[in-house]
Regions:
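Terminal RNA-binding accessory module
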Residues: 1-70, 74, 111, 153, ...
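Rossmann-like S-adenosyl-L-methionine
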Residues: 1-7, 13-17, 223-374
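Short, acidic/hydrophobic/Gly-rich beta-strand patch recurrent on exposed beta strands
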Residues: 20-25, 149-152, 217-219, 360
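Short, conserved phosphate/pyrophosphate- and ester-handling motifs at nucleotide-, phospho-/glycolipid
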Residues: 38, 168, 298
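Internal alpha/beta scaffold segment
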Residues: 157-201, 222-254, 260
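Short, aliphatic-rich beta-strand segments
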Residues: 205, 212-221, 286-290
Length: 374
C-alpha cells in the first residue's frame, strides 16, 4: 500500500490514542484516526512507515452498530468530540479495552504479571461536565463572517461556532454568544495565521462546578489599529456582565499574545473586572485556580479518581491513617497531595517549578492542612 492510495475498510478496533484499525477487503490494515469500531470508512493513505500505513478519514460510509445515540448539532463537523454517537457505557468499554492492551503490551497479562485490573469508573455527569474551554476566533470558511468556537475536524484554519456545545453548561454558551455578538457588531478582525494580522485570538472560559465561580480571559494581539482598545475592552466587559448566568463572575481578564504559534500564550495579563483567579472544591477541599494553571477539566470525575486513590492508600483498614507517608512526584500546585493528606500521616510533594511550590503551600494553608510538605 502506497502513499496516496484511496480505499475503504471496516474498523476492527480502536487502539490508544484514538487509532482506528481499518481492515480492507484484501486484509490490509490501515490506521485511521477518529473512527469507531464497526464503521465502514473511506480513507486516503498519507503515511507509510515500516510497512505500516496510516490514512486520513475521508468519509464514514456505514455507521457502526454501536452508534445509537443522538449527538450534539455540531458533531461530525466539530473536531472536539469523537464518540458522541456511542452510548456512554460502550465508550467506557472501549477505553477499558485500550487501557488493558496498553498494560499487557508493557508488562503482560494479569495472570503473567500478577496485577489486579479493577475495572473502570465512569463520570457522574455525561454532558455539561467540562469546567474549562479554549475557544478560537476565525471564520467558518475563507473570508466568511467572524466565528468563535472549535476547529473543524481535519482543518487547521476553519472553525465551527459551537453555540450549542453539549459538553459545557448554559453559562459557557451564553458567554460564547455574548462575545461573538459583541465583536461581530464592532467589526473587529481575528488574527489570521497566514498573514499574522488581526486582533482576536482566543477566549478562555473556566467555571467551577462546585462554587459556580466564572473567569473569562480574552486573548488578543497588540494590533489595535482602527479602534480604541480601552473602549473596546470596556464594552466587552459590559457585554459579558449584563447577561444572566446560573454561576457568578469572579473575573474578566485580557491577555496579550503576539506569538505566531496558534496556542494560548501569556505575554501579559490585565484584570478588566474582579480577580485573576477563582476557587473550586474537590472532596471538601478548596483550590485557588488561575486562568493558565492545570486543573482536571471534569471536577466530578476528578473526585471519583481521587477518592479511588484514597482507597488504595487506606487499604483494608478504612479507619486508620496507617502512619503512611505519600510522595506526590511532579506535584505541580499540589492538588493531589492535598487530596491525599486526610488519609495518611504525611504527604511530600516534589516539584521543580518554584512558583508551583509556592502555590501548593498557599493552597495547603487555605485548607488548614499541616501534614503537607512541598
Amino acid at each position: 500500500m502506497k502513499k496516496g492510495f484511496r480505499g475503504t475498510g471496516t474498523v476492527e478496533r480502536v487502539d490508544f490514542p484514538n487509532k482506528g484499525i481499518a481492515v480492507t477487503d484484501d486484509g490490509d490494515r490501515v490506521i485511521v484516526k477518529n473512527t469507531i469500531p464497526g464503521q465502514k470508512v473511506e480513507f486516503v493513505v498519507n503515511k507509510v512507515k515500516h510497512q505500516r500505513a496510516e490514512g486520513r478519514l475521508m468519509e464514514v460510509i456505514e455507521k457502526s452498530p454501536l452508534e445509537t445515540e443522538e449527538p450534539c448539532p455540531h458533531f461530525g463537523m466539530c473536531g472536539g468530540c469523537t464518540y458522541q454517537t456511542v452510548p456512554y457505557e460502550k465508550q467506557l468499554d472501549m477505553k477499558l479495552t485500550q487501557v488493558k492492551k496498553l498494560i499487557s503490551d508493557a508488562i503482560g497479562t494479569e495472570k503473567e504479571s500478577g496485577y489486579e485490573f479493577i475495572g473502570i469508573h465512569g463520570s457522574p455527569k455525561k454532558s455539561e461536565y467540562r469546567n474549562k474551554m479554549e475557544f478560537s476566533f476565525g471564520d467558518e470558511y475563507k473570508d466568511g463572517p467572524l466565528a468563535l468556537g472549535m476547529h473543524k475536524r481535519g482543518s487547521f484554519y476553519d472553525l465551527v461556532t459551537v453555540s450549542d456545545c453539549q459538553i459545557v453548561d448554559e453559562d459557557f454558551r451564553t458567554i460564547l454568544k455574548a462575545t461573538l455578538d459583541y465583536f461581530s457588531k464592532n467589526n473587529i478582525p481575528y488574527f489570521h495565521r497566514a498573514t499574522h494580522k488581526g486582533y482576536l485570538r482566543h477566549l478562555l472560559v473556566r467555571k467551577a462546578t462546585k462554587t459556580g465561580e466564572i473567569i473569562v480571559d480574552l486573548v488578543t494581539t497588540t494590533q489595535t489599529e482602527g479602534f480604541n482598545e480601552e473602549e473596546l475592552l470596556a464594552g466587552f466587559r459590559y457585554a459579558l456582565l449584563t447577561r444572566h448566568y446560573d454561576g457568578r463572575f469572579k473575573g474578566v481578564l485580557h491577555t496579550q499574545n503576539d506569538s505566531v504559534a496558534d496556542v494560548v500564550k501569556n505575554e501579559g495579563t490585565d484584570v478588566l473586572y474582579g480577580d485573576s483567579y477563582f476557587y473550586e472544591e474537590l472532596l471538601g477541599l478548596k483550590f485557588k485556580i488561575t486562568p493558565f494553571s492545570f486543573f482536571q477539566t471534569n471536577s466530578l470525575g476528578a473526585e471519583v479518581l481521587y477518592e479511588t486513590a484514597r482507597e488504595f492508600i487506606l487499604g483494608d483498614d478504612k479507619d486508620s491513617l496507617n502512619g503512611k507517608t505519600v510522595y506526590d512526584l511532579y506535584s505541580g500546585t499540589g492538588t493531589i497531595a492535598q487530596l491525599m493528606a486526610p488519609v495518611c500521616k504525611e504527604v511530600v510533594g516534589v516539584e521543580i517549578v518554584e512558583e508551583a511550590v509556592c502555590a501548593a503551600k498557599e493552597n495547603a494553608a487555605l485548607n488548614g492542612l499541616d501534614n503537607c510538605k512541598f
